[in-house]
Amino acid sequence: MGLTIRRIRDWVFTIPFLLGFGLALVVFDVAGRIVRPFGLRPFERVMAALQWTLIAVFRICGTKVSVERSPLVAAGTGYAVVANHQSLFDIVLIGGLLFSNYPKYVAKKELGRFIPSISLNLKHGGNALIDREDRTQAVAAIAEMAATAQARDVSVVILPAGTRSRDGRLGPFRRGGAEAMLAAADCLPVVPAVIDGSWRLLRNGLMPVPFGTVVRVRFGEPLSRHAGDAADVGERAEREIRRTLAAWRAET
């Protein structure tokens, strides 16, 4: 198929995708505001449904999601998830695939404004909004989120690379935030999560979305914990993520 034809095909499917994506954000923003007075758990269920819906919307563009999940990663249980970061779709993937674990996220404070559903969830769903220029505030917010999540037996997620990868290559991990999260949630097993291919979805800034992108996701076996192991278990998770990515790349 020629480049021009592929580009036309991408746009043909991107237009209904963008309409569906925007509609989902607006509808679930309204739903979230309606249920929020009834407590955090109803709100979490609405946001979980949103993330499942957004995964389905990406299928309009022929996106295929291949998932490997350790049988030891159980539903309805709290985990500390350490993942690599390739695109904004990563959060949707983790939230949708671990919906029953009600994952909480670390996000830059700018995302807490003006984005239907997403900003609402980040502000009111027990997540950590951080100022990346203020390390003290960031670490404190992450630790508070993690401690609260552990007390409720829900999951926390951090993407230590911070900046999204533009080409799928894994950059250096920033360990400060991850160690703060793992120290505050020291009873939660650590799950290394690996995502590959999501960077291709947004390489054109959604204008258009490449048709037929394959995204692989792996939730590895939970890593055992012991007292004071935040730095060590974080490094083990990073090694597992890098090892899995290298193995996947070797297959192609």
Describe each PLM feature range.
Residues D29-P37, F43-V46, I60, A75-D134:
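Catalytic core of membrane glycerolipid acyltransferases/transacylases, capturing the structured
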Residues A138, M145-A146, V156, A161-R169:
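Soluble extracytoplasmic domains of inner/organellar membrane proteins
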Residues C61-E68, V139, R200:
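Short gly/ser/thr-rich secondary-structure transition/capping motifs
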Residues M1-L3, V67, A250-T252:
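Soluble, non-transmembrane catalytic domains of enzymes that act on hydrophobic metabolites at membranes
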Residues K123-T148, D153:
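A membrane-cytosol interface segment of integral membrane proteins
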Residues L3-S66, L120-N121:
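A transmembrane-helix-recognition feature enriched in membrane-embedded lipid enzymes
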Residues A227-T252:
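A cross-taxonomic marker for long C-terminal extensions/tails that follow the last structured domain
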Residues P116-L120, S155-V157, R166-D232:
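A cross-family acyltransferase "interaction/gating" segment
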